[in-house]
Amino acid sequence: MAHTDPQQLYRLIHTLDHAGFDCFIHVDKKSDLRDYGFESYSLHYSKLTVLQKRYRIRWGDISIVEATLALYRAAMEAGNYDRFVTLSGQDYPIFPNDVLAEKLSAPRVEWIMGNILEPKEYHKVENFYFWKLGRFKKCFTLLFSALGIRKRRYITVDQEKWDVYFAPQWHALSSECVAHILRTLEAHPHILKYFKYAYAPDELLIPTILFNSSEFRVRSLASAFPEDTHYNQKTALHYINYEPCVEILRENRYYEIMSSQKLFCRKVKAGVSDQLMDMIDKANQSERIPQHEHET
């Protein structure tokens, strides 16, 4: 998913050009597609699909979930893929593509780590957050709270009580898991409605469906953390420094990144992180193996 920095997105997609990967891109509706110059992309192995249906993305809003689900559906309809990896346009791979492909091909593993919502986070689902109201959103959230208008901090599905789970937005799920998520939402549309006015539902809706499934919960990398575990330790795929906000990574983080054993790092930015990405590319170059014909 991309909303800024077309130059960085170009570098990311061309770095991921590999016989085992295809790329599906959603560009924020607020952005001008012409700035991205997709017609100039010259991929040798990966198929590139740019979604025509676009959502106006707002931070913390359900629109991020809608865009993610649109990408899932597009990929499900386009081919028989084994793994669905969600990335932002400001991510960058740490390992060579062949190593990434090997790691992500592990069977019966869901690359996601999460936990039941902690008490200090109950507000994320109990309160109503009206992100589309712009500068007035806080007023309405406080008004609803003062009037005692709140949601339950759990959701009922097929007469079962589901706890709400948290997990960072970026993960890599199996085709079976993605199909389960889409089927569940189709059969139970009230789930999407429940999270519509939540706080950052992109970190709640998909984890809640996944971790309330006994089959997929045991396939996750982690389904529980000690209370107050830092966000940085909850990312399944990414090296990230969220202190106090997401750091734009530079070359001084190189050794931390390369020793992290994560698959990707974020955030990177063209003109700021170029030396870091060059260093990663150089470290990986000798390990890259010539690729063969495209495989779905």
Annotate the PLM regions:
Residues M1-T296:
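ER/Golgi luminal nucleotide-sugar-dependent glycosyltransferases, focusing on the catalytic module
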